[in-house]
Amino acid sequence: MQVVDEKTILELENERFDESSQFKTPEKLIVEASDMTAFRQSKAYYRIFDFLQRLNIASVGVNDYHVEYSTRVEKLVRILCRVKEITKTVPPASGRHRFGNPAFRIWHEKLRDSASQIMDIIIPDSLSKAKVELLDYFLGSFGNSQRIDFGTGHELNFLGFIKGLDLLGLLDAADYKAIALYITHVYLEVCRELVQTYRLEPAGSHGVWGLDDHFFIPYIFGSAQLADKASSSIIKPDAILNKKIVDEKANSNLYFSAIKFINVMKKGPFYEHSPILYDITAVPIWSKVNQGLIKMYDVEVLSKYPVVQHFHFGNLFPFNPLVAK
C-alpha cells in the first residue's frame, strides 16, 4: 500500500454522488494475481479501507450492539428483513449433497428477482440510476449461488453496498455506530441462517489457519466495542474460552456473538478447530487485538487475490489510482 497524505484521503471521503452523477455496471477488473498491485493503489481500495476504519472508530467502547438508529438505518433493517424472509420460502433440498445444498441456487434466484424492488426501500426515484452499481454489491453480499459458498469476499461486498449508500447521501456519518454494530448484527443473523440452512461452504477458506470459516468483520467491530480502558479492565480476550461468558456476552458484543456461532458449528477442542482465535486469547488487551485484526483484514482479505477478484468496479468504487502517477 502506497503512503497517501491525509488531505487526499479526506478529499476521497468527502466525495459524494447525486442524481446528476454518472453510474455504470460494475466490471470485473481483477482477473489475475498481478492486478492486485493496481487494486492496492486504487480509489476503491482506499475508499473501502477508510470506511472500515471509520466504522471501527464508531464502535469503540459501545457496550451493546443494540443501539438506537435513525430512519435512514431503519430502512437498511427493513431491507435485511426482506432478505431473511426469502429463506422461509425456500426449504433445503432433501437428500445427501456433497457440497452445500442446491436449494441455495433457488434462494439466490429469488433474491435476484426481488432485489430491485427491495432497493426501492432506501433508494429514491431521483437516484434510481445508481441501482445498477448498488445491486451488484448487494447481490454479492449473500454468498455465491454457483459455488454454494459464503466468505469474507461477500462481507466485502456488503461493506461496498453500505458505503455506496453513504456516498449517495442516503446514510450519514452519524449512522456509523449503528451501521457497524446493529446493521452488522442483523446482516450476520441473515447470513448465519443461510450458512446453516443451505450448508454453505467456506469461500476462500484457509482451513483451520483462517480466522473463521465464513466471517471476519464481527471480530473487528466486536473487539472495538471492548477496546476502551473501562471494558478492557472488566473482560479479557481469553474470556472467549469460557462458554458461560460467551453465551452471556453474545447478546451484546459482536466478537462474542461470532465465537458463539463457532461453538455451535464446530466440535472438539477450541484450540484445534480455531487456532488463530485461540492464539489471540494470549493478547493482554482488546485495543491490541483490535489493531491486529484491522492489519490482518488488510493482509488476509484486501490483499488476497482469491477474495478480491470477485469485487467489481464502477464509478462508486473506481479502479483508477488514488494518486496519479
Curated annotation (Swiss-Prot):
Localization terms from the record: Cytoplasm; Nucleus
SUPFAM superfamilies attached to this UniProt entry: PTPA-like
Domain of life: Eukaryota
Top enzyme category: isomerase
GO molecular function, one term: peptidyl-prolyl cis-trans isomerase activity
One example of a Gene Ontology biological process annotation: mitotic spindle organization
Catalyzed reactions: [protein]-peptidylproline (omega=180) = [protein]-peptidylproline (omega=0)
Major subcellular site: cytoplasm
Pfam families reported for this sequence: PTPA
Listed Gene3D superfamilies: 1.20.120.1150
Keywords (A to Z) from UniProt: Cytoplasm, Isomerase, Nucleus, Rotamase
Cellular component aspect of the GO annotation: cytoplasm; cytosol; nucleus; protein phosphatase type 2A complex
Enzyme Commission code(s) on record: 5.2.1.8
Protein family per UniProt: Belongs to the PTPA-type PPIase family.
Protein purpose: PPIases accelerate the folding of proteins. It catalyzes the cis-trans isomerization of proline imidic peptide bonds in oligopeptides. Acts as a regulatory subunit for PP2A-like phosphatases modulating their activity or substrate specificity, probably by inducing a conformational change in the catalytic subunit, a direct target of the PPIase. Can reactivate inactive phosphatase PP2A-phosphatase methylesterase complexes (PP2Ai) in presence of ATP and Mg(2+) by dissociating the inactive form from the complex.
Protein name, as recorded: Serine/threonine-protein phosphatase 2A activator 1
Protein's organism: Schizosaccharomyces pombe (strain 972 / ATCC 24843)
